[in-house]
Amino acid sequence: KIAEYVGAKYACAINSATNAIFLSLLNKNTIVNIPSMIPPVVANAIITSGNEVEFYDDVDWAGHSYVLHTFEDYKIVDSAQKLEPNQFMKGCEPNDLMIFSFYPTKPLGGSDGGMVVTDDYEKYKWFKTIVLNGMTYANNNWEREIDFPGYKMYMSSMQAKIIMNNFESYDKKMRVLGNLVDIYNRELGYENSSKH
């Protein structure tokens, strides 16, 4: 449902957006530039996945998406603080990755969790396999096979249930928050569009 909402073909649910960042950059051996005012989990995920971090000054990304890293043929977009209709379709190419967070303080909060969306089936299949201990996905557990060493990073059933329950009223929540943002902007002379 969330992939459809943001305009992507595929979505892989993960136990946290931090782990989604970690996996999306795993063994890329590159330098990733990130805003200096950002939760430490982002830098930690970049470093522990085998990369280096360089910081730049930027506060305008807060409450919005930003390009985490651009490779030769695709980019990774960190959208932990934003979730809007057709967001992937509007801001990404089919082979890009967009990462969402379902941490309790995020727009679509849950008990925790993350998601990677893309239109690239091969990337989607890789994520589905690596988060399931490197096993191929099959509805029947006994038909799963080990493809490669992976991680236990799949989203739990409890996380998914809470997120999907909250997703049912998400648009209403965004309308209410939008009205509050409008009031603050009008009264304080701001031009903020974030609902985070």
Could you say what each language-model-derived stretch is?
Residues 7-9, 25-31, 58-59, 68-74, ...:
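Short glycine/proline-enriched coil/turn segments at helix->beta-strand junctions
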Residues 25-87:
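PLP-dependent aminotransferase-like
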Residues 14, 56-58, 193-196:
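Conserved beta-strand termini and adjacent loop/short-helix elements that scaffold enzyme active sites
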Residues 83-85, 94-196:
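Active-site region of PLP-dependent enzymes
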Residues 14, 35, 101:
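Conserved residues at the C-terminal ends of beta-strands
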Residues 19, 40-41, 122:
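Short alpha-helical
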Residues 1-32, 45-49:
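Phosphate-binding glycine-rich loop
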